[in-house]
Amino acid sequence: MNLEHMGKAAQEAAFELATVATAQKNQALAIIADELEANKDAILAANAKDINAARESGMTDALIDRLLLNEERLTGIANDVRNVISLNDPVGAELDSRVLENGMRLSRRRVPLGVVGVIYEARPNVTIDIAALCLKTGNASILRGGRETFHSNVELVKVIQVALKKADLPAASVQYIEKPDRELVSQLLRLDQYVDMIIPRGGAGLHKMCKENSTIPVIIGGFGISHIYVDHSADISRSIDVVENAKAQRPSACNALDTLLVSEKVAETFLPRLAERLNKSNVEFVADDAAYSFLEGKAATLRHAADGDFDTEWLSFTLGVKVVADVAEAIAHMRKHNASHSDAILTNDIQSAERFVNAAGSAAVYVNASTRFTDGAQFGLGAEVAVSTQKLHARGPMGLEELTSYKWVGQADYLVRP
C-alpha cells in the first residue's frame, strides 16, 4: 500500500470536490444511507467477526459495546447521514464583507480544508460519520481505523465507494488504509505535501503519538477526564438522575462521567443515595477517604482511590468520587486532573454556576445537565468527526463548519494599487 499515491489521489479528489454542487454531494450521502440499509446483512456479518475476535482477546463488555453494530444502530447511522443532507452546506458561505475606500468589495468565504486524515480506534460508525461530513464540506478523507473493527470498516468503505461511483464523484474522495501496520500511521503523519489536517480519535496514547510525530496540524480531542460537581445547593434527587445518566447510560463514551466531586455540605446525604441507585448498574466506586466513609456499607463495590485514579478516563462502570469543600476546590481539582472535555455543575446557586462556567477549562461546560450531551447530533450539528479539546481552530464537537477554513475574496473594477 503506497500512501504517497493515496495522498496524491486524495489531493486531486479534493480539488474536484471543492467545486462540486451541494446537490451532487447530497446525492452521494443519500446513496450511502440507502446502501447501509440495503447491505445490512453483510455489514453485520463482518461486525460479528470483529466482536468474536474482541471477546477472544478478553476485551471488556464496555469496550466491546463500542465495536458493536446491530440493526438498530445501523439504521441510526443511516439516519445520521440523512440528517447531514438536511444541514446547510457551509462551503461558499460568506462570513462577512465590506467595501474598502478604494471601491474593492472584500469578503471572507468558507472553503474546504482539503484532505483530512483521520486515525481512529473502535467505533465503526466513525467511518461513516467522517466520510459523510467530509463529503458534505468538499473535503477528501484518508481513514485509518483500528484493527479491532477491521472487517466492519472494510464493508462500510465498500458502501461508500458504491455511493461515490453512483454519484459520479472521485473514488479517492474517501480512501481507507486497510493494512493495520503502525508504520503506515507514521507515514500518514508525514504526508504534509498532500494532507491538510490530522484528526486522531482514541486514547491518550494515540493523541500523544500523533502530536509528537506529525508534520501536519493535528486536532487533539476525544480524551479528557469528565467531571460533575454537586454543589451544596443542588437538588439531591434530580442530581442523582443526572449522575446516573452521565455514568451508566453508555460508560464507554468519551463524554461519560469519570470523576464525581461532591460538596462536603451534602456528601453525607447524597453519596449513600447515589450508591443505592448506581448499585443497580454495578458501578464500582473509587473514593477518596472522605467519600469512602460515606459510601462504606452502601456501595456494593468500593475501593480506596490510588495514585492516578483521578487521572483515569474509565470508559467502564467505574466512578472516581471525591469530597471537596466548595466550587473553588472542585475547579482546582479539575485543573489538576485534565478537565478538557466535558464538565458540569449541579447547583441552584447562580453565583456558583457562573463561577464554574467561567473558570472551567473544558471544551463543553454544563449547568444542571449531563456531560453526555457533548455530541454533534445532540448539538444539532449532525454527526461529528471528533470532539476537539484544544483551543485553536475548533473546540468541542466538530461538525460541518469546523471542517472548513476561509479565503479572502476581493472584487473590484480592474483596480490597481497606487
UniProtKB/Swiss-Prot annotation:
Matches recorded under InterPro entries: Ald_DH/histidinol_DH, Ald_DH_C, Ald_DH_N, Aldehyde_DH_dom, G-glutamylP_reductase_CS, Glu-5-SA_DH, GPR_dom
Location (main, coarse): cytoplasm
Cross-referenced PROSITE patterns: PROA
EC main group: oxidoreductase
Intracellular or extracellular location(s): Cytoplasm
Catalytic reactions of this protein: L-glutamate 5-semialdehyde + phosphate + NADP(+) = L-glutamyl 5-phosphate + NADPH + H(+)
Biochemical pathway: Amino-acid biosynthesis; L-proline biosynthesis; L-glutamate 5-semialdehyde from L-glutamate: step 2/2
Pfam entry (one): Aldedh
GO CC aspect terms: cytoplasm
One of the GO BP terms on file: L-proline biosynthetic process
Family designation: Belongs to the gamma-glutamyl phosphate reductase family.
Function: Catalyzes the NADPH-dependent reduction of L-glutamate 5-phosphate into L-glutamate 5-semialdehyde and phosphate. The product spontaneously undergoes cyclization to form 1-pyrroline-5-carboxylate.
Protein name per Swiss-Prot or TrEMBL: Gamma-glutamyl phosphate reductase
Native source organism of the sequence: Photobacterium profundum (strain SS9)
Gene this protein is translated from: proA
